[in-house]
Curated annotation (Swiss-Prot):
Membrane association type: Multi-pass membrane protein
Parts of the chain that traverse the membrane: 52-72, 79-99, 101-121, 141-161, 173-193, 196-216, 235-255, 299-319, 376-396, 397-417, 433-453, 476-496
Annotated localization: Membrane
Pfam families noted in UniProt: Xan_ur_permease
Protein family membership: Belongs to the nucleobase:cation symporter-2 (NCS2) (TC 2.A.40) family.
Protein name: Putative nucleobase-ascorbate transporter 10
Listed GO MF terms: transmembrane transporter activity
Lineage, highest ranks first: Eukaryota, Viridiplantae, Streptophyta, Embryophyta, Tracheophyta
Record keywords: Membrane, Transmembrane, Transmembrane helix, Transport
Gene Ontology cellular component list: membrane
InterPro entries linked: NCS2
Length: 541
């Protein structure tokens, strides 16, 4: 007997209605989260990858600034070793007593403008001996860094930064975290193109190994010939030596013998002067260049740079929490982490590390590429940093990797950092015109405003004008894509999206409320709790 009508057949044939992708408070797909360490051998290899990646910025900034100060290869080597030593110490402090997230502390670009102003100050033009000018300039930079480090520690201890971070919502975090990656576009392809014959093959090889090779390893019906996850997990350690060897072959064959000085510096594997000038053993010690000198006008611009690194590090803390498969980091823990970064700035000022300390954007991207967000991996990486800063000959060998090769890796890892900010938009209502305006305006102005200041000061309009401390403060803040994006997004978010329950829901604030205080989510202790029951003595609120 057949059923009458077609209603039942229609119901049986009706396809399941498509639903949006579900919201995920913790990112799935991470193979080892913050507090789940991989096996020791694997952790050592992964930690070494993070160490290699941190070398790029550690070598780049002293290589630019030390010659301007009058220093030679010997001075540059000592500054690099000191910077690496302080970065390793600060990373350990951060992983044990700070945010406890898998982040690495490295040299900051934000301090370059105030440091350059100190270098070109007229009070150092009277020194004809290059070494004497280097020492005098370094002492002045150290004094400014010491004051800046104390300033950063103070505003974090007093809870000022914690209260600022509490104004954040998923809507304002999106541009903040996104531009921590996008804002470093100048160390991507522009740096790679300085030696395109080694940089471009490196980029292509990395993309193939990490993205396409796992697909080729699959047989029919999804059976793997080899574990494809190993490709992205160890893609860096597989590709960088191959491209480095290719660069060595080009150097040995005389390809660059008659090229320009700039090309040889970027492409040759024997032009850094690090290996020959690095001592076998060197331990950085306080005030190795003499007693610091203090000038309050130098410190003002440095404090502005510290303000910029606070925004950058905050965005990267949220990014690393995402890639570590942790819950969103509470504001009190953010303040705790930035306080330890201030300690790193203070240590750099005491030891002579030439610049301030911030969270490494590149290493956060490597968390995503490897899908390993373990805290132990970062602690091992910090141990590598300290070891190779003391036993310098070994570290100098790895630091001699040409920067265009490192730039090929930056093009990969920075894209992951840029995209993690966009993932916070899953908590927002993207059909709201208010949300569309805030997002679009903050993104557009974060590109447009820094470009205006870059043209205004470097494009010839004011290129012959010696800037003062106030102009340096303005330049540092408004030439930072991350800071501009964060300020605009926070102001618009707080003034346009907090006046009703519906508006708060649109910007994600309703979902965000349970993460604004440490004790409102029981999972926070799992990821952010201090060791040895220190939470009893240093409670988070």
């Amino acid at each position: 007997m057949t059923n009458g009508g077609g209603g039942n057949n229609g119901a049986a044939n009706r396809t399941e209605e498509l639903q949006p992708h579900p919201v995920k408070e913790q990112l799935p797909g991470i193979q080892y989260c913050v507090n789940s360490p991989p096996p020791w051998l694997e952790a050592v290899v992964l930690g070494f990858q993070h160490y290699l990646l941190s070398l790029g910025i550690t070598v780049l900034i002293p290589s630019v600034l030390v010659p301007l100060m009058g220093g030679g290869y010997a001075e540059k080597v000592k500054v690099i070793q000191t910077l690496l030593f302080v970065s390793g110490l600060t990373t350990l402090f951060q992983s044990f007593f700070g945010t406890r997230l898998p982040v690495i502390a490295v040299a900051s670009y934000a301090y370059i403008i105030p440091i350059t102003s100190i270098i070109y100050s007229t009070r150092f033009t009277y020194y004809t001996d290059p070494f004497e000018r280097f020492v005098r300039t370094m002492r002045s930079i150290q004094g400014a860094l010491i004051i800046t480090g104390c300033f950063q520690v103070l505003i974090c201890i007093l809870g000022v930064w914690r209260n600022i971070v509490r104004f954040l919502s998923p809507l304002s975090i999106a541009p903040l975290a996104t531009f921590t990656g996008l804002g470093l576009y100048h160390i991507g392809f522009p740096l790679l193109a300085r030696c395109v014959e080694v940089g471009l093959p490196g980029l292509i090889l990395l993309i193939f190994v990490t993205q396409y090779l796992p697909r080729f390893l699959k047989m029919k019906k999804g059976v793997m010939i080899l574990d494809g996850s190993r490709c992205d997990r160890y893609g860096m350690i597989l590709c960088i030596p191959l491209v480095w060897l290719f660069a060595q072959l080009l150097t040995s064959s005389g390809v660059y013998d008659h090229k320009s000085h700039t090309t040889q510096t970027s492409c040759r594997t024997d032009r850094t002067g690090l290996i020959t000038n690095t001592p076998w053993i060197y331990i950085p010690y306080p005030f190795q260049w003499g007693s610091p000198t203090f000038d309050i006008t130098d410190s003002f611009a440095m404090m502005a740079a510290s303000f910029v690194t606070l925004f950058e590090s905050t965005g990267l803390f949220y990014a690393s929490a995402r890639y570590g498969s942790a819950t969103p980091i509470p504001p009190s823990v953010v303040s705790r982490g930035t306080c330890w970064l201030g300690v790193g700035v203070l240590l750099n000022g005491m030891l002579g590390g030439i610049t301030g300390i911030t969270t490494s954007t590149e290493n956060v991207g490597l968390l995503a590429m490897t899908k390993i967000g373990s805290r132990r991996v970062i602690q091992i990486s910090a141990a590598f940093m300290i070891f190779f800063s003391i036993f310098g000959k070994f570290g100098a060998f790895f630091a001699s990797i040409p920067l265009p090769i490192m730039a090929s890796l930056y093009c990969i890892v920075l894209c992951f950092v840029s995209s993690v900010g966009l993932s916070y938009l899953q908590f927002c209502n993207l059909n709201s015109f208010n949300i569309k305006f805030i997002l679009g305006f903050s993104f557009f102005m974060a590109i447009s405003i820094p470009q205006y200041f870059r043209e205004y000061y470097n494009g010839g309009w004011r290129s012959d004008h010696h800037s003062n401390w106030l102009e340096d403060m303005i330049r540092v803040i408004f030439m930072s894509h991350t800071t501009v994006a964060a300020i605009i997004a926070i102001v618009l978010d707080c003034t346009l999206c907090r006046d009703s329950d519906e508006a708060k829901k649109d910007c994600g604030m309703k979902w965000w409320d349970k993460f604004r205080l440490y004790n409102l989510d029981v999972r926070n202790d799992e990821f952010y709790g201090l060791p040895c029951r220190l939470n009893k003595f240093f409670p988070s609120h």
